[in-house]
Design a protein with these regions (language model features):
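Catalytic cores of the polymerase beta-like nucleotidyltransferase superfamily
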Residues: 1-200
Length: 200
């Protein structure tokens, strides 16, 4: 199924404006699970910030290392994490993959995490926008785990279904079928890599 994402300006979702403070002073974009929590009226614990290039990542890393409002938490091959001293929110600067917003969302497994807040830059003009999957709100409301395209890391996706079950989410029939087919093609030698490099 082809992904045709919806794009809205940053005035469309007032409850997401709390993320504005985490969008400044870097070229990254926020995507993934925090939007699931925001639109479910729950407190989000962490924010994943992605980047188009390694240079953009390094610029953001330098900013947060020097920012007295943040404290370093941990670092691994996938990301570097900082915590805001005032809000206690954790931000993860993701470096496991560099690409644009739409390409990144296509790489996410479930429709309920295919949501991003980004800066659309056209010359000297910068607009803050949202991009999300057409069935994001429907699947979130119905607590459905839907793989609309494919999963690059099916074992990781399978593991994540257990996490979501604790919050009342369940896979639709088509997703179960698709995930079973994907798992059959997994090389046993790649299990560790699949779990480690999967996207949130």
């Amino acid at each position: 199924m082809e992904n045709k994402f919806i794009i809205k300006d940053n005035e469309s979702f007032f409850k997401c404006r709390k993320l504005d403070q985490y969008m400044s002073n870097h070229k990254g974009y926020i995507a993934g699970g925090c939007f699931k929590d925001i639109f479910s009226n729950k407190k989000f614990r962490d924010i994943d910030i992605f980047f188009e290039t390694p240079e953009d990542f390094n610029q953001a890393l330098d900013f947060y290392r020097k920012n007295e409002d943040y404290v370093f938490v941990y670092e691994n091959d996938n990301a570097v994490c900082f915590s805001n001293k005032n809000t206690k929110k954790k931000i993860e600067l993701v470096r496991s993959r560099f690409c644009g917003v739409e390409e990144m969302l296509k790489g996410f497994d479930f429709t309920i995490v295919k949501f991003a807040y980004y800066k659309a830059i056209d010359g000297d003009n910068t607009e803050w926008k949202y991009m999300y999957h057409p069935s994001f709100f429907e699947d979130l409301t119905n607590k459905k785990l839907v793989i609309d395209d494919t999963s690059s890391f099916p074992v990781n996706t399978f593991e994540r279904t257990y996490k979501y079950r604790k919050y009342g989410f369940g896979m639709c029939r088509e997703t179960k079928k698709k995930l079973i087919e994907l798992l059959q093609g997994v090389n046993i030698d790649d299990l560790g890599k699949d779990l480690y490099f999967g996207f949130d």
